[in-house]
Regions:
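Short aromatic-centered micro-motifs
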Residues: 82-85, 184, 274, 298
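Short strand-turn-strand beta-turns centered on an Asx-Gly dipeptide
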Residues: 85-91, 187-188, 277-278, 301
Length: 600
């Protein structure tokens, strides 16, 4: 599909303050323009900004020629509870603020006329995050346009089958049956070209090569994989999970001559150009084989790799939450220059621009899904929506990550104390298995705070099986109430909405009346406790026997056990659980060298 920039000529208007609309270019973080006040309900987590709901509008001409075309609008990130309207009709809704999504415009456009697209981003429902989230359409937007015969978005999937000899598999989805061609290039020079045929998914001919200039691939050679003539696991999974209009695909298995492998020191990148009819899609990929096991840890192309990683959040400092390729690359460059070779997207899926930077620079990525499951850490966070959306969210994260050699694992969450309870242990397994069905080439982890899991299991904080059920119900109730309030506040998509912090924001610092000291709850309880007891006590606490009891079942439901602040458990657990692969998913900076010594 043709990808068209859709970032210019937008107008932004605040719905929670009486302000005039102003022109913006995406990406745009509306929170940066807000006043700050000590009465901010999001407090320091959002930099004492007041929060607000915003309306983005853009008028654009839709030509008559689009009548017979497939047109999607992609938003890489809207924070949060994004609503998309086209010519006054609601076309899409996406509650999670960190996953990209596509809006199908069929039935909404008026052809040969000016059209209006309107996006509402709600962030007056504070607090809803433990870190600065930004507000609005803070990542880029694009139009994707295609004719009758096209390759859908995320329709080209590339994986390495082996590195010695170098062999790759390319699966191409199409909207119709027909001939398609692939051209593999390295640094602008052609490596090989093949022509194949896309047929209905499940058809025995959908992996037929018509012609090839690859000496190791003969014309009409069948490239089926697996035993007994079965399709590869990837093809079977793709057929099952395919939810796009495309029902056709071609599968290519190609030997790459004189391959230049991808690793942290030599991040060699290839391009794959797939042509189907008049549609052309170009994907960048690297040839690298990832293996993980308890005996050697993790290897890339047969070489053991010790991760020297950092957790980082998605914002770009004074630039706010906006995603700019230059800023994303700058972060990775600084880390790389200081000896890091891996990063963790704490605690949300990272941007496409960041993945591109990691690919180019040889930085390994652990892409993380979410900071909260079904129990609140803040009052209006994602707990209320996760049950309905986690599968779609994970699918979109995998689609984004799949062709990037830098992505070496997925994380299903951060310090989700639900993993100490039966319901959470089951969800751990469900998420792991679902990710395996989407991508069998990468391991799955989850960052668990070992000591806090134990505390939650004895009722300190908000977590227990009974409380989990109640909190999950309350989460849905709170989300419904918040949505109801927002509907009442924005009656005609334009009437002013008001909250306490907004009113006080107009008056500078607001009321000077002393407030009652709040009792720490939820995540705040654990953060307060950590500050009081200190890092050494936390690490010692993690060695308690009950901590093992409250984490072992969840760890058994993932490929790699994520230890947050569990450095004192490593040697003991490696002996007790010889088949467990441990990742230091989070720790104190001063322990970095000790981690390195243990890992070696």
């Amino acid at each position: 599909m043709q990808k068209i920039d859709f970032n210019k000529d937008w107008m932004c208007r605040c719905l929670t303050r009486d302000e005039a609309a102003y022109p913006v270019t995406l990406p745009h973080d509306a929170m940066l323009s807000e006043p700050r006040t000590q009465e901010s309900t999001g407090e320091g987590n959002i930099g004492w900004y007041i929060g607000g709901d915003y309306e983005y509008t853009r008028n654009f001409f839709v030509p008559e020629t689009y009548k017979d075309k497939k047109v999607l609008i992609e938003f890489e990130g809207i924070y949060h509870n994004g609503e998309v309207y086209i010519n006054g009709k609601k076309a899409a809704y996406r509650p999670y603020g960190y996953t990209n999504f596509y809006v199908d415009t069929e039935g909404f456009f008026q052809y040969g006329k000016e059209n209006e697209i309107k996006v509402i981003a709600r962030n007056a429902d504070q607090p809803n995050s433990r870190w600065y989230p930004g507000t609005g359409i803070y990542r880029p937007a694009y139009l994707h346009v295609a004719g009758e015969k096209y390759i859908p978005v995320n329709g080209v999937k590339i994986r390495t089958l082996s590195y010695d000899p170098a062999k790759i598999e390319v699966v191409v989805k199409t909207s119709a049956p027909g001939e398609l061609s692939l051209k593999i290039e390295f640094e602008g020079s052609k490596v090989l070209r093949v022509i194949g045929e896309s047929t209905k998914i499940g058809n025995v001919n959908n992996d037929k090569i018509i012609s090839s200039d690859n000496k190791n691939m003969q014309p009409n050679e069948s490239v089926q994989t697996g035993k007994n003539g079965q399709k590869s696991e990837l093809a079977q999974v793709e057929a099952e999970k395919n939810n796009q209009a495309a029902e056709y695909q071609a599968i290519f298995q190609l030997d790459v001559p004189n391959a230049k492998l991808w690793d942290t020191e030599h991040p060699n990148l290839y391009t794959c150009k797939a042509v189907f009819g008049e549609d052309e899609v170009t994907e960048t990929f690297g040839i690298r084989e990832l293996i993980w096991n308890p005996q050697v840890g993790m290897t890339i192309n047969g070489e053991r790799v010790i991760l020297r990683g950092a957790c980082f959040h998605h914002d770009n400092g004074v630039l706010g939450a906006c995603t700019y390729p230059e800023a994303e690359e700058r972060k990775m460059r600084i880390l790389k220059e200081n000896g890091y070779n891996a990063v963790r997207s704490a605690h949300y899926p990272c941007s496409k621009a960041l993945l591109d930077a990691c690919d180019r620079m040889g930085m390994l990525m652990m892409d993380e899904y979410v900071d909260v499951w079904y129990i609140h850490k803040t009052k209006y966070d994602y707990a209320g929506q996760l049950a309905d959306w986690w599968k779609q969210d994970l699918k979109d994260m995998v689609d984004k990550d799949y062709n990037h050699p830098s992505v070496i694992m997925y994380s299903t969450g951060n310090e989700v104390a639900e993993t100490a309870q039966k319901k959470g242990i089951a969800l751990t397994g469900d998420m792991t298995n679902y990710l395996h069905s989407l991508d069998s080439t990468r391991p799955v982890t989850c960052g668990i705070n070992i000591f806090f899991n134990f505390l939650s299991s004895i009722g300190l904080g908000v977590y227990s099986d009974d409380k989990a059920e109640k909190s999950a119900g309350n989460a849905e109730k709170n989300a419904a109430q918040a949505a109801g309030k927002n509907e009442k506040k924005v009656v005609k998509s334009g009437e002013k909405t008001v909250n306490k912090a907004t009113e006080n924001g107009k008056k500078g610092l607001g009321s000077t009346k002393p407030e009652k000291k709040k009792k720490p709850v939820g995540s705040e309880f654990y953060n307060t406790l950590a500050c009081l007891v200190g890092d050494y006590f936390m690490k010692c606490g993690a060695t308690l026997y009950p901590c093992d009891l409250r984490t072992k079942d969840a760890y058994a439901n993932m490929d790699i056990a994520g230890y947050n602040y569990g450095i004192f458990r490593y040697k003991h657990d490696l002996k007790k659980y010889p088949n467990r692969l441990i990742l230091g998913s989070e720790t104190f900076c001063k322990d970095a060298y000790s981690f390195w010594e243990i890992a070696q």
